[in-house]
Every structure is written in C-alpha cells, then in structure tokens.
Amino acid sequence: MYSQRFGIVQREVKGPTPKVVIVRAKPPKGQGAEHHLQRIQHSHQKHHAILASIKSIERDRLKTEWDQHNDCKFVDSLVKARVKDAMQGFIINTEERRNKLRELLASEENEYFTEMQLKEETIEEKKDRMRDKIRLLREKKEKERQDFVAEKLDQQFRERCQELRAELFCIHQKAVCEERKAQIAFNEELKRQKVVEEQMFSKLWEEDRLAKERREAKEERRQKELVENTRLGLNAQVTSIQAQRQAAQRLKEEEALLVENENAQVKLENEQDKLKKQKTKQEIRAALQKALQEKMERMQQEYREEQDLNMKLMQNALQSLQEETDKKKQKKEDMRREQKIYYQYLAQRHEEEKAQEKELDRMLEKEKEKKFAEKDKELRLEKEARKQLLNEVMCTRKLQVQEKLQRKAKEQEERTMEQERINEGLKELNCEERENFIRRCSLAQEYRKQLQMQICSQQQAREAEEEEERREFEAGIAAEKSFQDKIQGILSTHQVVPRNIHPMRRACSTKLPP
C-alpha cells in the first residue's frame, strides 16, 4: 500500500561515516480481507439502494398513471354530461320553436280565411285576377326578354360594327397620345431638374475647390513664415557661435605669443596645453554641432508633428481623399507630377480618341465602300437580270408575233375558203330566200309585235324595279341615319375604363392629365 502510494523506497540509508547504514522500519501490513469485506458490503448497500429507488420510482409511476386515468375518466364523464345537457336544451328549444311556428302559421291561415270570407271573392273575379296577374307576368317576361335581346343586339353591334370600333380606336389612340405627351413633358421636367441639380453640385464643388485653394495658399504662407523665422533663429545661433570661435581664436593667438617667449620646456608644456585646448575646443565644437543638429532635428520633428496634426485636422474637417506629405515642397512636386500625368493622360486620351475616330472613319469608309460595292453588285446583277428578262421577253414576243402571223395567215386562208363556201351557199340560198321571203315577212311582223309586248312588259318591270330600288335606297338612308345616331349615342355615353393602367400614370396620377 505504501509502495503503491509513494513508489519503491530504499530502506537502507547511508550514515555520516563509512560503513554506517541506517535501516528504515517496514510499513505496517494492510488488512486486505477487511477492506475487501467492506467493499463487498458497500457494493451490496449500493445495490439495495438502487433496487429500493427503482421500486419507489415504479410505485410513483403507477400512482401517477392511476391518477391520470381517474382524471381522464372524470373529464370524460363531465364532458358527456355537459354534451347531454346541451343536446337536451337544443332539442327543447327546437320543439319550442316548432310549436311557436305552428301556432303562427295557424293564426296566419285563420286570418287569411277570415279575410277571404270578408272579401267574398267569386270564382270569376278570382279568374280575372289570376288572368291579370298572368298577363302582367307575361308582359314583364316579354319586356325582360326584349331588354335582354336589345342588350345582346347592342353588344353584337358594338362587336361587329367596324365604324364604331374605328371611332373607339381613334378615341383611345387620342387618349394614349395625350398621355404620351404628358409623359414626355414629365420626363423633360425630370431632365431639367437633373440639369439644375448637376449645375448646383458643380457650383458647390467649384466653391469648395476655391476655398480649399485659399486655405492651401494661407497654409503655405504660414509655413513660409515659420521656415523664415526658423532660418533667422538658426542664423543668429550660427552668428553667436562664430563670434565665440573668433574670441577663442584671438585668445589662442595671445597664448601663442606668450608661448614663443618661454623656453623649450614651457613651450612643450604650452604645446601640451594647446593640444588639450584644441581637443577641448573640438569637443566643444562637436557638442555645439551636436546640439545644433539635435535642435534642428527637434524643430524638424515638431514641424513634422505640426504638419501631421494639420493633415489630420484637414482630413477630419474636409473628408479629403488626398494625403498631404510632411513637406509642402514634396506635395507641390506630387501635384506637379500628378498634373503632368493628368496632362499626359489627357493627351493620351486625346490621341486615343483621335485614333478611335480615325479607326471609326476608316471603318465607316470601309463599310461605305463595301455597301457601295454591294449596291453596285446588286445594280449590276439587277441590270443583267433585267437585260436577260428583256431578252427572254423579246424572244417570247418574237415567237408570239410569229405564231400570230402564222395564225393570221391560216385564218386568212380559212376565211377565204369560208367565203367561197359562203358564196356558194348564198347562191343556193338566194333561191330559198325568194321562196321564204313572204313567210319571213309575216313572221317578222309577228315577231315585231311580240318584241313590242316584251318591251312594254320589260319597261313596266324596270319601273317597278326602280321604284323598289328607290324605296330600298330611302330605307337604307334611314337605316344609315339611325346607324350613325346609334354610333353617336354610344360614343356620347361611352366611358373608357382602362384595364391596364400605365406605370407612369399610376405613379404620377396627380401630375398627368386625367
């Protein structure tokens, strides 16, 4: 147990002197059987506790199910009782309403019989009344039928009358034209407003640009003044340093005169002092230069910080897209470079536009030449086709003329032969005509009488037809007049109901004409 908790532990421990060993005591032996028995008892206790918990849960579940079953039975019985009461009440109310209705019908029937007895209406009067009622119903139905027929005829007239449809189409087209004019005016107004807004924005942009240029000029003047003041201060410092140097130089010259009058040892000492002084002066000069450089750097740093602060303030105030650099000179160079690039871009753009225009002109010329070539080709083909057609027509005409000449020659021969046969026949008929002359004269007189009778009958029929045509013409004029009156009446009472309203009219109903 001990070894399991602390690992393997050496029992022998070396002492303070050689061959001196200390032995650790053995740990007490664990009572394994008791621990095992305790574990078994603990597991049995846990098992019995789990069984008891399961039994308790099962008992609670059965109890809950029993309670739910009882609640469901109670609710079902309660619902059935309430439904039964409601049905009985409904049946009772229905019976009461039926009884009341029976009593009301009986009372109305009694009143009707009483009224009939008071009126003492006879069968003839009743028949007359029924006939009048039937006549009125027939007249009403006939009127409804006539109205329906008139409505359908009017509808058929509206659908089939081309003149009415043309008039309605003209009215609709006129309304559409008016709406289109109003829409065009509305679009022109929108364009004008857009132009005004663009002019206003360009004016504001120009004012903003001028204000920015004024601020930049003011800032540039302020920077120049600051640089000038700094330069003057630095010049004053340099002048003071030069004065100090001149004073030191004069002191050095005086010391040199004193050193020349001394002996060699003093001269050596003076030389050493001189070297020390020169070193000191160099250190002073280096310190002064370093201080001057640090001051210049500090002023430049302050200037840069001030420039950065001004840049941040300008960016926050104007929301500008350009970032200014720490020095105005660099900014001017950038502006010049950008302007130069912009001019180069404009020149390049101009050259590209010129090249595009030249290319477009070349393409147009090429297209024009191509079209002219195609047109010349079409004209040439058309001319050749016309010439070929003319040749074919001339050939056909020539053949027709030849055929006609041949046919005429043949007909002339046939006529000559026919004339000869006719002459022979005439000679034969002359004798027959002399014999039949008297008979033909009598037949001619009879035929003349029949012709006169036919002419009279035809003249009478013609007069009757003319009279009939006149009556039909007058009826047609009357029908045309009624037709035009009907069209005008429909047009005067016609009211166009737009089924498909234009989106512009729907969106701007107050601005467009009705």
UniProtKB/Swiss-Prot annotation:
One of its GO terms (cellular component) is spindle pole. Pfam families: TPH (PF13868). GO terms for biological process: cilium assembly; cilium movement; determination of left/right symmetry; flagellated sperm motility; manchette assembly; sperm flagellum assembly. It comes from Bos taurus (Bovine). It is found in: Cytoplasm, Cytoskeleton, Cilium axoneme; Cytoplasm, Cytoskeleton, Flagellum axoneme; Cytoplasm, Cytoskeleton, Microtubule organizing center, Centrosome, Centriolar satellite; Cytoplasm, Cytoskeleton, Spindle pole. The keyword Transferase does not apply. This is Cilia- and flagella-associated protein 53. The keyword Coiled coil applies. Residues 207-429 form a coiled coil. Keywords: Cell projection, Cilium, Cilium biogenesis/degradation, Coiled coil, Cytoplasm, Cytoskeleton, Developmental protein, Differentiation, Flagellum, Spermatogenesis. It comes from the Eukaryota. Microtubule inner protein (MIP) part of the dynein-decorated doublet microtubules (DMTs) in cilia axoneme, which is required for motile cilia beating. Regulates motility patterns of both 9+0 and 9+2 motile cilia through differential localization and recruitment of axonemal dynein components. Required for centriolar satellite integrity and non-motile cilium assembly. Required for motile cilium formation. Through its role in beating of primary cilia, involved in the establishment of organ laterality during embryogenesis. InterPro entries: CFAP53/TCHP, TPH_dom. Microtubule inner protein component of sperm flagellar doublet microtubules. Interacts with PIERCE1 and PIERCE2; the interactions link outer dynein arms docking complex (ODA-DC) to the internal microtubule inner proteins (MIP) in cilium axoneme. Interacts with CCDC38. Interacts with CCDC42 and IFT88. Interacts with centriolar satellite proteins PIBF1/CEP90 and PCM1. Interacts with dyneins DNAIC1, DNAIC2 AND DNAH11 and with ODA-DC component ODAD4/TTC25. Belongs to the CFAP53 family. Expressed in trachea multiciliated cells.
